[in-house]
C-alpha cells in the first residue's frame, strides 16, 4: 500500500514538472497556466474588498502605463497585466498569479522616481513570470501529499504533521532566493524597457532605510523591532550585498546609453497624494481617532497603539496583552442593543450587563463569560451598529483592564465642529528647495511626530543625515 502511494506521489511530481518561462529551469508545479489565470482573477476580487483602489484616475492610469512598459519586456508578455494602486498606508506591494499586481500608496510615497516605481512593479512582474506563488502552492501541496502517504503507511498521524512542518519550512526557505530572483528579472525588464536598472538597488535602499528607522524607533520605545516587511529583512546595506549586486549585474549589460530615471515627472504625479490614514478609513492622531465620514471620535489610554484597517479598528497595549477591536455593522432596528448583543453571542452567557447612555445615543455592554472572558458592547447610531470586543491574553486579566476598556467605549461621541479638520488626511506636497533651506527648517512646519525630520528624510531618500540641494523638488507634508 505504502509503495503504491509513493509511486502515485512520484508520478504526480513528474506530471507537475514544467519549464519555467523566466529561468528555463524545470520547476515542480501542480497548476496549469489556465488555472493560474483563473486563480488570480478570483482572488483579485477578494483583494479589492480588503484593499480598495485609491481614488485618483490619473495616478491609476500612470501606474498602469509604467507597469505595462516593464511587462512588455518580460518573459510572459502575453499576459494581461493589471496594475492597481490600493488605498493603504502600508509600505508594501504584491502580486497574484496571472498578472494582478498591487502597490500600496504607502510605498509609493517613499519612492523618488519613475524608474523606482518601475523597479517595484518590475520586481512583482518577476514574481509572476517566475511563477513564484504557483511554485510555493505546488511545494505545499506536494509535502501535504507526502505527509498523507506516510501517515497511511505507518499509521502514525504525527508523521503527517512533521511532513507539513518540513514542507512549510522548505517553502519559507525559498524567500530570499525568490526575492533575489525577482530583483534580477525585474532589473532585466527595467533595462529592456528603457529604465535605469540601478533603480532596483535604489528601491532596496529605500526599504533598508525604512527598516533602520523602524529599528531605531523601537529601541527608543524599549521594544523589539517588528519582523521584516516588504522584501523581508536586510542583513547588509544594498551597496554591500554581494548576492543582490550579482543578480542585478546582468541587467546593467542590457542597458543602453540613455536609461530613463524620470524623477521630476514622477514627483509631480505624487503632488496631493494622501499620506498615512485616509479619510475613508479614519485618522489616527496620537491616542485619538477621528472619522469625518462617519462623524465620530474615540480616545484610547495613553501609550496604546492603534491599528487601522478597512474593516476593523484595534487599540492595544504596547505589550499587546490587552486589546479592543471596533467593527461596523448594519442595525436591525427590530432589536434593542441588548438583544443585538445576545443574538451575536448565541448560546454564550452575558453577565454584568448595563445600558449605555452616550448623550442621545443608546447602547449596551456586558461581559461574555467563557474560558477567556471578553468585554463586549454595541452602540446604535442611525443605521449603524458600532460593535466593540475587548480581550486580554498572557498574564493580563480582564478585571485589571476592564475599566480602561469601558473608558474607550464610553469615549465614543460625534465630532465637534473644531475637530472636523482633525479628520482630514495629511497629503504630500512638493516644494522647490531654496538656498539656505535645511531639512530641520522644512520639517518644523510639517504635521509630523517627534521624529518628523527623520520621517521627512525618509520620504525624500535622504535618511539618515542627507540635506536637499537648492532647486531640488522635495516632498513635504501638510
Where are these regions (language model features)?
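A Zn2+-metalloprotease active-site environment signal
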Residues: 5, 13, 17-300, 305, ...
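Residue-level recognition of short, solvent-exposed, well-ordered loop/turn junctions
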Residues: 38, 299, 434, 463, ...
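Short, surface-exposed polybasic-and-hydrophobic patches located at secondary-structure transitions
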Residues: 316-328, 426-435, 476-478
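Surface-exposed amphipathic alpha-helical segments
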Residues: 118, 254, 390-429
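Signature of long, low-cysteine stretches enriched in small and polar/charged residues
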Residues: 325-327, 341-387, 391
